[in-house]
A protein has these predicted regions:
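Conserved beta-strand positions in repeat-built beta-propeller and related beta-rich domains
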Residues: 47-51, 87-92, 134-138, 176-183, ...
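WD40 beta-propeller blade core
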Residues: 55-56, 95-97, 141-143, 186-188, ...
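Bacterial Sec-dependent N-terminal signal peptides
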Residues: 1-26
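Blade-level signature of beta-propeller repeat domains, shared across WD40, Kelch, NHL, RCC1
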Residues: 243-269
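A short beta-strand motif characteristic of beta-propeller blades
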Residues: 22-31, 62-68, 105-114, 150-162, ...
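Repeated scaffold domains used in trafficking and secretory/extracellular systems
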Residues: 33-40, 72-80, 117-124, 163-172, ...
Protein backbone atom coordinates (compact mmCIF):
# COMPACT_ATOMS: atom_id res chain seq x y z
CA UNK A 1 0.00 0.00 0.00
CA UNK A 2 2.86 2.37 0.86
CA UNK A 3 4.42 1.71 -2.57
CA UNK A 4 1.07 2.50 -4.20
CA UNK A 5 0.83 5.93 -2.56
CA UNK A 6 4.47 6.63 -3.38
CA UNK A 7 3.75 5.81 -7.02
CA UNK A 8 0.68 8.07 -7.06
CA UNK A 9 2.69 10.92 -5.53
CA UNK A 10 5.48 10.58 -8.10
CA UNK A 11 2.93 10.38 -10.91
CA UNK A 12 1.27 13.61 -9.69
CA UNK A 13 4.62 15.40 -9.57
CA UNK A 14 5.45 14.21 -13.09
CA UNK A 15 2.09 15.33 -14.48
CA UNK A 16 2.32 18.69 -12.65
CA UNK A 17 5.85 19.28 -13.97
CA UNK A 18 4.88 18.31 -17.53
CA UNK A 19 1.81 20.56 -17.44
CA UNK A 20 3.96 23.40 -16.14
CA UNK A 21 6.50 23.08 -18.94
CA UNK A 22 3.83 22.75 -21.63
CA UNK A 23 2.39 26.15 -20.67
CA UNK A 24 5.66 28.05 -20.84
CA UNK A 25 8.38 28.80 -23.36
CA UNK A 26 11.58 30.40 -22.10
CA UNK A 27 12.62 33.15 -24.53
CA UNK A 28 15.34 35.15 -22.79
CA UNK A 29 17.41 35.01 -19.62
CA UNK A 30 20.05 37.31 -18.16
CA UNK A 31 22.18 36.88 -15.08
CA UNK A 32 21.82 39.92 -12.83
CA UNK A 33 22.98 38.70 -9.45
CA UNK A 34 21.18 40.22 -6.48
CA UNK A 35 19.26 43.34 -7.52
CA UNK A 36 17.40 46.00 -5.56
CA UNK A 37 14.53 46.79 -7.96
CA UNK A 38 13.43 46.15 -11.54
CA UNK A 39 10.62 46.70 -14.04
CA UNK A 40 9.71 46.26 -17.71
CA UNK A 41 8.67 49.14 -19.97
CA UNK A 42 5.93 48.90 -22.65
CA UNK A 43 8.60 48.11 -25.27
CA UNK A 44 9.61 44.94 -23.35
CA UNK A 45 12.86 46.51 -22.17
CA UNK A 46 14.00 45.60 -18.67
CA UNK A 47 15.43 48.20 -16.29
CA UNK A 48 17.03 47.12 -13.02
CA UNK A 49 19.03 48.63 -10.18
CA UNK A 50 22.20 47.00 -8.93
CA UNK A 51 24.70 48.51 -6.52
CA UNK A 52 25.10 52.17 -7.54
CA UNK A 53 23.81 51.84 -11.10
CA UNK A 54 20.73 51.55 -13.25
CA UNK A 55 20.96 49.13 -16.17
CA UNK A 56 18.62 48.99 -19.16
CA UNK A 57 18.45 45.97 -21.45
CA UNK A 58 17.26 45.91 -25.04
CA UNK A 59 14.69 43.36 -26.19
CA UNK A 60 17.47 40.82 -26.78
CA UNK A 61 18.53 41.21 -23.13
CA UNK A 62 21.77 42.95 -24.04
CA UNK A 63 22.86 46.00 -22.03
CA UNK A 64 21.63 49.13 -23.83
CA UNK A 65 22.27 51.90 -21.27
CA UNK A 66 23.76 52.30 -17.80
CA UNK A 67 23.51 55.23 -15.40
CA UNK A 68 25.15 55.93 -12.05
CA UNK A 69 22.75 56.68 -9.19
CA UNK A 70 25.35 57.43 -6.50
CA UNK A 71 23.92 60.91 -6.06
CA UNK A 72 20.39 59.56 -5.73
CA UNK A 73 20.81 56.66 -3.31
CA UNK A 74 19.78 53.03 -3.35
CA UNK A 75 16.88 52.55 -5.78
CA UNK A 76 14.16 50.47 -4.10
CA UNK A 77 11.37 50.91 -6.67
CA UNK A 78 11.35 51.28 -10.46
CA UNK A 79 8.09 52.00 -12.32
CA UNK A 80 8.68 51.94 -16.08
CA UNK A 81 5.13 51.85 -17.42
CA UNK A 82 5.69 55.15 -19.27
CA UNK A 83 8.49 54.26 -21.67
CA UNK A 84 9.80 57.83 -22.10
CA UNK A 85 9.71 58.73 -18.39
CA UNK A 86 10.50 56.10 -15.76
CA UNK A 87 9.94 56.75 -12.05
CA UNK A 88 12.54 55.66 -9.48
CA UNK A 89 12.28 55.77 -5.68
CA UNK A 90 14.84 55.59 -2.87
CA UNK A 91 13.40 54.67 0.51
CA UNK A 92 16.70 55.47 2.24
CA UNK A 93 16.83 58.98 0.81
CA UNK A 94 13.03 59.54 0.80
CA UNK A 95 13.14 60.85 -2.73
CA UNK A 96 11.80 60.17 -6.21
CA UNK A 97 13.21 61.05 -9.60
CA UNK A 98 12.38 60.55 -13.26
CA UNK A 99 14.66 59.25 -15.99
CA UNK A 100 14.16 59.27 -19.75
CA UNK A 101 14.50 56.32 -22.11
CA UNK A 102 18.31 56.65 -22.06
CA UNK A 103 18.35 56.63 -18.22
CA UNK A 104 19.21 60.34 -18.10
CA UNK A 105 17.79 62.16 -15.07
CA UNK A 106 14.87 64.45 -15.88
CA UNK A 107 14.05 67.59 -13.83
CA UNK A 108 16.15 66.72 -10.79
CA UNK A 109 15.33 64.87 -7.57
CA UNK A 110 12.09 65.29 -5.59
CA UNK A 111 12.43 65.38 -1.78
CA UNK A 112 9.29 63.78 -0.36
CA UNK A 113 9.61 65.58 2.97
CA UNK A 114 8.59 68.75 1.12
CA UNK A 115 5.19 67.10 0.62
CA UNK A 116 4.82 66.57 4.38
CA UNK A 117 5.57 62.87 4.02
CA UNK A 118 6.90 61.50 7.29
CA UNK A 119 8.28 58.20 5.97
CA UNK A 120 7.45 56.76 2.54
CA UNK A 121 7.86 53.04 1.97
CA UNK A 122 6.39 52.65 -1.51
CA UNK A 123 5.39 54.61 -4.60
CA UNK A 124 3.57 53.92 -7.85
CA UNK A 125 3.09 55.75 -11.11
CA UNK A 126 -0.43 56.75 -12.09
CA UNK A 127 -1.92 56.38 -15.56
CA UNK A 128 -0.66 59.88 -16.37
CA UNK A 129 3.10 60.45 -16.38
CA UNK A 130 2.78 63.66 -14.33
CA UNK A 131 1.09 61.88 -11.39
CA UNK A 132 2.29 59.31 -8.88
CA UNK A 133 1.21 57.76 -5.58
CA UNK A 134 3.21 57.83 -2.35
CA UNK A 135 2.46 55.69 0.71
CA UNK A 136 3.38 57.40 3.99
CA UNK A 137 3.76 54.50 6.40
CA UNK A 138 4.16 56.61 9.54
CA UNK A 139 0.82 58.33 8.99
CA UNK A 140 -0.95 55.48 7.16
CA UNK A 141 -1.94 57.73 4.27
CA UNK A 142 -1.72 57.82 0.50
CA UNK A 143 -0.80 60.89 -1.50
CA UNK A 144 -1.53 61.34 -5.19
CA UNK A 145 1.07 63.83 -6.36
CA UNK A 146 0.35 65.85 -9.51
CA UNK A 147 3.36 67.74 -10.85
CA UNK A 148 1.01 70.33 -12.33
CA UNK A 149 -0.58 71.14 -8.97
CA UNK A 150 0.83 72.57 -5.77
CA UNK A 151 -0.81 70.25 -3.26
CA UNK A 152 -1.30 66.48 -3.53
CA UNK A 153 -4.60 64.67 -3.12
CA UNK A 154 -4.50 62.83 0.22
CA UNK A 155 -6.30 59.69 1.39
CA UNK A 156 -6.05 59.75 5.17
CA UNK A 157 -6.18 57.04 7.83
CA UNK A 158 -5.89 53.86 5.78
CA UNK A 159 -5.25 52.04 9.04
CA UNK A 160 -8.73 53.02 10.19
CA UNK A 161 -10.27 51.81 6.92
CA UNK A 162 -8.33 48.58 6.48
CA UNK A 163 -7.26 47.77 10.02
CA UNK A 164 -3.70 46.63 10.64
CA UNK A 165 -1.90 47.17 7.33
CA UNK A 166 1.57 46.06 6.29
CA UNK A 167 1.89 47.35 2.73
CA UNK A 168 4.26 45.29 0.61
CA UNK A 169 3.37 46.44 -2.90
CA UNK A 170 1.56 49.48 -4.30
CA UNK A 171 0.39 49.53 -7.89
CA UNK A 172 -2.01 51.54 -10.03
CA UNK A 173 -2.99 49.93 -13.31
CA UNK A 174 -5.98 50.63 -15.57
CA UNK A 175 -7.50 53.08 -13.04
CA UNK A 176 -7.36 50.48 -10.26
CA UNK A 177 -5.13 51.10 -7.24
CA UNK A 178 -3.89 47.90 -5.63
CA UNK A 179 -2.59 47.71 -2.07
CA UNK A 180 -0.96 44.36 -1.34
CA UNK A 181 -0.51 43.12 2.22
CA UNK A 182 1.25 39.73 2.17
CA UNK A 183 -0.42 38.58 5.38
CA UNK A 184 -3.99 39.56 4.47
CA UNK A 185 -4.48 39.94 0.74
CA UNK A 186 -5.01 42.49 -2.01
CA UNK A 187 -7.17 45.60 -1.63
CA UNK A 188 -8.53 47.23 -4.79
CA UNK A 189 -9.44 50.93 -4.80
CA UNK A 190 -10.69 53.26 -7.49
CA UNK A 191 -8.55 56.32 -8.23
CA UNK A 192 -10.72 58.43 -5.92
CA UNK A 193 -9.82 56.34 -2.90
CA UNK A 194 -12.95 54.19 -2.51
CA UNK A 195 -12.38 50.48 -1.88
CA UNK A 196 -14.05 48.39 -4.57
CA UNK A 197 -12.88 44.85 -3.79
CA UNK A 198 -10.69 42.66 -1.62
CA UNK A 199 -8.98 39.41 -2.60
CA UNK A 200 -8.10 37.42 0.50
CA UNK A 201 -4.84 35.48 0.25
CA UNK A 202 -1.93 34.76 2.55
CA UNK A 203 0.03 32.83 -0.08
CA UNK A 204 0.78 35.58 -2.59
CA UNK A 205 4.39 36.73 -2.99
CA UNK A 206 3.97 39.31 -5.76
CA UNK A 207 1.11 40.89 -7.73
CA UNK A 208 0.42 42.51 -11.08
CA UNK A 209 -2.60 43.75 -13.02
CA UNK A 210 -3.15 43.68 -16.78
CA UNK A 211 -6.08 43.62 -19.21
CA UNK A 212 -8.71 43.64 -16.46
CA UNK A 213 -7.13 40.70 -14.66
CA UNK A 214 -5.40 40.56 -11.32
CA UNK A 215 -2.39 38.26 -11.16
CA UNK A 216 -0.65 37.02 -8.07
CA UNK A 217 2.17 34.53 -7.64
CA UNK A 218 2.49 31.88 -4.95
CA UNK A 219 5.37 29.45 -4.46
CA UNK A 220 3.92 27.11 -7.10
CA UNK A 221 1.34 28.94 -9.20
CA UNK A 222 0.50 32.06 -11.12
CA UNK A 223 -3.11 32.86 -10.25
CA UNK A 224 -5.18 34.97 -12.66
CA UNK A 225 -8.49 36.50 -11.53
CA UNK A 226 -10.98 38.23 -13.81
CA UNK A 227 -12.10 41.14 -11.65
CA UNK A 228 -15.53 41.40 -13.30
CA UNK A 229 -16.72 37.80 -12.91
CA UNK A 230 -14.19 36.41 -10.41
CA UNK A 231 -13.19 33.62 -12.78
CA UNK A 232 -9.95 32.12 -11.45
CA UNK A 233 -7.25 30.37 -13.50
CA UNK A 234 -4.31 28.68 -11.78
CA UNK A 235 -1.19 28.14 -13.87
CA UNK A 236 1.73 26.07 -12.55
CA UNK A 237 4.94 28.11 -12.57
CA UNK A 238 7.75 27.17 -14.97
CA UNK A 239 10.34 26.86 -12.19
CA UNK A 240 10.86 27.15 -8.45
CA UNK A 241 12.19 29.97 -6.25
CA UNK A 242 10.73 32.85 -8.26
CA UNK A 243 10.79 36.20 -6.47
CA UNK A 244 8.51 38.54 -8.46
CA UNK A 245 7.01 38.96 -11.92
CA UNK A 246 5.62 41.36 -14.53
CA UNK A 247 2.92 40.76 -17.15
CA UNK A 248 3.09 42.25 -20.64
CA UNK A 249 0.46 40.67 -22.85
CA UNK A 250 1.29 36.96 -23.14
CA UNK A 251 4.84 37.57 -22.00
CA UNK A 252 5.67 37.05 -18.34
CA UNK A 253 8.94 38.32 -16.90
CA UNK A 254 10.20 36.63 -13.74
CA UNK A 255 12.86 37.61 -11.25
CA UNK A 256 14.83 34.77 -9.65
CA UNK A 257 17.48 35.27 -6.95
CA UNK A 258 20.11 35.62 -9.71
CA UNK A 259 18.37 36.16 -13.07
CA UNK A 260 15.59 37.93 -14.92
CA UNK A 261 13.81 35.67 -17.39
CA UNK A 262 11.26 36.27 -20.12
CA UNK A 263 8.71 33.55 -20.79
CA UNK A 264 5.92 33.22 -23.32
CA UNK A 265 2.71 31.96 -21.75
CA UNK A 266 0.92 29.65 -24.13
CA UNK A 267 -2.85 29.84 -24.35
CA UNK A 268 -4.65 28.69 -21.23
CA UNK A 269 -8.36 28.55 -20.53
Amino acid sequence: MRNYFTFIGLLFLFVFSSFSQENWELLKSVETGKILAWDVDPMSKVIYAKNDALIKLDTSFNVQFTQSVKGFGAVTKIDARHSLKTLIFSEDQQSVAFIDNTLTFHKGIKDLSLLNVSYATNVSYSAQSNRYWVFDDDNSKLLLVDENRRAPQVIENLQGTLGSLSLFQLLEMENVLLIFDRTLGIYLFDIYGSMIDFIETSEAKSIHFADGRLYYMTDDELVRINIKNRNVVRIPLPEKDLVSFRVLGRYIFFQTPTHIKKYFLKKVR
